[in-house]
């Protein structure tokens, strides 16, 4: 993340919030209620993101960020990295590689798009209901790992946040 632009970081944040429930479902339901992996949508962090959009202070955003949220931005200050806390200890290599590929695809998509265009596209999702198409555009051939029968309500909550 050290070499990433603020545009990329913002894109990662909004994409993460949109897909957060899908990530938790992939990682396993036990993680959703874990106090060391609190969903961003269940905190006041989306307000911090909105404030960042207004005031453009990355330092204040990372300072306000909660360490035990599912996506932890606090390491940005010291290490130039972000931390995804969803994945519990696991021995299934294929499962872990799938998780890594999902995150890689999210980051790759975030780097390719301008924030304002992505933001506008996300804002229309609850109107167009193009959730599955959006998942497929971001995660490509790995999208099937996130497509569930509750895709619409899971993504609606992220889009509305």
Question: Where are the model-predicted features located?
Answer:
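C-terminal accessory/tail domains of diverse enzymes
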Residues: 3-161
